[in-house]
Amino acid sequence: MAKYTREDIEKLVKEENVKYIRLQFTDILGTIKNVEIPVSQLGKALDNKVMFDGSSIEGFVRIEESDMYLYPDLNTFVIFPWTAEKGKVARFICDIYNPDGTPFEGDPRNNLKRILKEMEDLGFSDFNLGPEPEFFLFKLDEKGEPTLELNDKGGYFDLAPTDLGENCRRDIVLELEEMGFEIEASHHEVAPGQHEIDFKYAGAVRSCDDIQTFKLVVKTIARKHGLHATFMPKPLFGVNGSGMHCNLSLFKNGVNAFFDENADLQLSETAKHFIAGIVKHATSFTAVTNPTVNSYKRLVPGYEAPCYVAWSAQNRSPLIRIPASRGISTRVEVRSVDPAANPYLALSVLLAAGLDGIKNKLEAPAPIDRNIYVMSKEERMENGIVDLPATLAEALEEFKSNEVMVKALGEHLFEHFIEAKEIEWDMFRTQVHPWEREQYMSQY
């Protein structure tokens, strides 16, 4: 049931002096886009009559089929806490529809709903996500452009005066709470200038909406503090990168399908099949969960990011960890995902991988309770531990050869995603980087 009715929204915008409405959506690369309308056009928006040119959006449609419609999700209505000069701004997150009234297959949000329908057909009622997005704060220069100077030199769980981002982080939390977020914790992360704010899990679509809103709020409030917030996975060499650990759980009629108090580790057969599916498809879905050239600079040994496909209930070196909580809180934590990922697409491939394990009753390998980082290559091979792709190019090749993952995106999204990412890789591959000049200019 919607949090607001149409009548509630029309009343609120008058009472709160809302002057503009943002109709937001997400493109294939995970970038937030919007069409902004004056409040006088609210009725038109609520009638699903607002059009936009889909050919101008990365991965949408060709110019000869460009008309698309924005259908606002009333559940996502919120008034931004910060006020513009001429009045308040509210927003809806929208689904994209074709002119004939059918969902647009290139809309990442619609795609996640399609995979959730497949989940429901298997008898499950809910798929929850608890994300842990990390970000860096850099100083701005006098022109308002980002610099490479970090805001502080703090470390894990530091506090002021070492943690100079504390006030900015607090303001972000307050703004998020005003927008309906339930914030569980916030703290300084391992690297200098790195931060994490954890918010409560929610259903799959709502949680992905929250991730997109979170990124927008973090960047907006950081700029008010003279800072630039980035969710780039590895902005600096020699320090930890930013991840977005994803805590996943399946429910059946209000009961956590991953929990069985009488089973080994109190993990149900459903949970073990789900883990097996994640393990089987990990090297393929990495192209979506870690979608940039820079993502693979994070997935290297020594910086607490997973490089190897394994699972454990005890240690944090594998791809998959099972946190200690049980009962309704039983969950599978996938640790490779980074915050550059399009959350709707990332969750689509993660759910599809897990469901494939459940449908085919795949057997999970034995858990690995040793520190994988110190194991030799031979030891890893003996234990059936494979490496995650080392580059975006490797990840794309793995992805293209996996039928389950291709179907998880659907033909339209798959083709446009691959096209965009192969162009990105080729641009990187042919670029001459500063390291090369430093290494070779004098030597040769």
Swiss-Prot record:
Keywords: ATP-binding, Cytoplasm, Ligase, Magnesium, Metal-binding, Nucleotide-binding. ATP binds at E184, S249, R316, R321. The keyword tRNA processing does not apply. The record marks R62 as: Important for inhibition by glutamine. One of its GO terms (molecular function) is magnesium ion binding. It comes from the Bacteria. Residues 108-444 form the GS catalytic domain. Completely inhibited by glutamine and partially inhibited by glycine, alanine and AMP. Also inhibited by L-methionine-SR-sulphoximine (Met-Sox). Binds 2 Mg(2+) ions per subunit. Changing F259Y: In strain: PCI 219. GO terms for cellular component: cytoplasm. Changing N253D: In strain: PCI 219. SMART domains: Gln-synt_C (SM01230). InterPro entries: Gln_synt_N, Gln_synt_N_sf, Gln_synth/guanido_kin_cat_dom, Gln_synth_cat_dom, Gln_synth_gly_rich_site, Gln_synth_I, Gln_synth_I_adenylation_site, Gln_synth_N_conserv_site. Changing E424K: Unable to form stable complex with TnrA. In the presence of glutamine, this mutant derepresses amtB-lacZ fusion and glnRA-lacZ fusion. Mg(2+) 1 binds at E132, H245, E333. Oligomer of 12 subunits arranged in the form of two hexagons. In its feedback-inhibited form, interacts with TnrA in order to block its DNA-binding activity. This inhibitory effect is the highest when both glutamine and AMP are present. Belongs to the glutamine synthetase family. Glutamine synthetase (GS) is an unusual multitasking protein that functions as an enzyme, a transcription coregulator, and a chaperone in ammonium assimilation and in the regulation of genes involved in nitrogen metabolism. It catalyzes the ATP-dependent biosynthesis of glutamine from glutamate and ammonia. Feedback-inhibited GlnA interacts with and regulates the activity of the transcriptional regulator TnrA. During nitrogen limitation, TnrA is in its DNA-binding active state and turns on the transcription of genes required for nitrogen assimilation. NCBIfam families: GlnA. This is Glutamine synthetase. It comes from Bacillus subtilis (strain 168). The gene is glnA.
